[in-house]
Amino acid sequence: MDRRRFIKGSMAMAAVCGTSGIASLFSQAAFAADSDIADGQTQRFDFSILQSMAHDLAQTAWRGAPRPLPDTLATMTPQAYNSIQYDAEKSLWHNVENRQLDAQFFHMGMGFRRRVRMFSVDPATHLAREIHFRPELFKYNDAGVDTKQLEGQSDLGFAGFRVFKAPELARRDVVSFLGASYFRAVDDTYQYGLSARGLAIDTYTDSKEEFPDFTAFWFDTVKPGATTFTVYALLDSASITGAYKFTIHCEKSQVIMDVENHLYARKDIKQLGIAPMTSMFSCGTNERRMCDTIHPQIHDSDRLSMWRGNGEWICRPLNNPQKLQFNAYTDNNPKGFGLLQLDRDFSHYQDIMGWYNKRPSLWVEPRNKWGKGTIGLMEIPTTGETLDNIVCFWQPEKAVKAGDEFAFQYRLYWSAQPPVHCPLARVMATRTGMGGFSEGWAPGEHYPEKWARRFAVDFVGGDLKAAAPKGIEPVITLSSGEAKQIEILYIEPIDGYRIQFDWYPTSDSTDPVDMRMYLRCQGDAISETWLYQYFPPAPDKRQYVDDRVMS
């Protein structure tokens, strides 16, 4: 699974559209755009032109691998790359009066080898000019870059861009597009976490995963005082092309992105992932196997939340399995889904480097009918926190054939909490541990005689307190094994209820156990549905080893 190695560092990218490829699809004009750093010829541009461009590009062969970078950039270390700074005095919207937003570009180099072209657009006239690379746009500091190798390299391009918001202009960015089709945003903590992608291809198939690239961006000049901007993107890959429109609202406590894409398949595609997101889960309250550090929990996200088309809410805690797992949850016109980080308590992480308690959640809200399909969740084994091991996306049911065209509209919310939540009782936390004894009576002189695994799921909110006098009933379904010693406990500190049960194996199978539970009262559901996947140990490991030394 070397496919993930670049995500936290130098992210690999796929195709790049050459200069002649894009330029030949533009009509020329004679208007001077108002961006000081835009130095290319004027070109007619709007979203319909971009759609035509992507459509026509899909009729041509993919251009394949990028050309080599100058040696001084190709051999850079991460430390050297990070020391390169864009000159804030030459930012994209530096001359906009009363600007609340500004944009800067990332330098090529290190693992960022596919050039991305940048254009400034006058939204009133629909005329664009390209922003060409030149060394004077950057401050190289002690990066050790031989700038003589960069002279005359106006077509070198950029690696990506980031956007800043007042009062932190040029200091703390709120949106970043960098590497392949990856992008991310922050909430009011300014702490980056999980990432989104433009598209995912063959994430879990017998084919090698394909990583499409955003190869060009067009920025509408931002209006004075505005906190919303629009950027368009051309996506290119061996199997597909796409035209994207991002309307990005940089609000006080969150970033909201309205996304519209038009996709054009070059080839048959086994697995097409829409609105994909990538995160990290090493260990948490439910999964302690890889938590032999000083940190109680290590994760960017703690759960997959789904609001199904039929109205059902589902909470699926994330895992760090010993073996790669892929699960697909069927749906029809989903109302929303996302990877959430709902535990915001610093004491639960004790991390002053990663600040996982500040990392945003990401919620996807479809804005048109997506039809039948599945929400795919892939969980990759990881030994630490430097590998993004969680992938989630929507996969349409319809097979993708060469020549097919698709259009999707959706909204992305980057925030501490999703914009909507289940009106019924919600899962607050999931915990697992040794079972086989009565709660509060873990034996001190010997281990339980029979091996079992305990699960404790905390529910809060909804009408739990009103339902309690009438009787709360946990409805538990298991794909294998038995649930015993089921208890319902009121937890005063959270003003909620803990449903606790022990899982006992009924066979020697080590296949994953799919667990499902919800609460009901007098026949009516009063909670969201909890889904979980447990990986039982081998039969010879289903015993407690007493390694105490008593003398």
Curated annotation (Swiss-Prot):
Any single biological process term in GO: glucan biosynthetic process
Alphabetical list of InterPro entries matching this protein: Gal_mutarotase_sf_dom (IPR011013), GH-type_carb-bd (IPR014718), Glucan_biosyn_MdoD (IPR023724), Glucan_biosyn_MdoG/MdoD (IPR014438), Glucan_biosyn_MdoG_C (IPR007444), Ig-like_fold (IPR013783), Ig_E-set (IPR014756), TAT_signal (IPR006311)
Pfam families in alphabetical order: MdoG
Gene Ontology CC annotations of this record: outer membrane-bounded periplasmic space
Signal peptide range in chain numbering: 1-32
GO molecular function: carbohydrate binding; catalytic activity
Record flagged with keyword Signal: yes
Keyword terms of this UniProt record: Periplasm, Signal
Record PTM text: Exported by the Tat system. The position of the signal peptide cleavage has been experimentally proven. Can also be exported by the Sec system.
Pathway listed: Glycan metabolism; osmoregulated periplasmic glucan (OPG) biosynthesis
Compartments, record wording: Periplasm
Superkingdom of the source species: Bacteria
SUPFAM superfamilies: E set domains, Galactose mutarotase-like
Role description: Probably involved in the control of the structural glucose backbone of osmoregulated periplasmic glucans (OPGs).
Family recorded in the similarity comment: Belongs to the OpgD/OpgG family.
HAMAP family assigned: MdoD_OpgD
Stated name of the protein: Glucans biosynthesis protein D
Upper lineage: Bacteria, Pseudomonadati, Pseudomonadota, Gammaproteobacteria, Enterobacterales
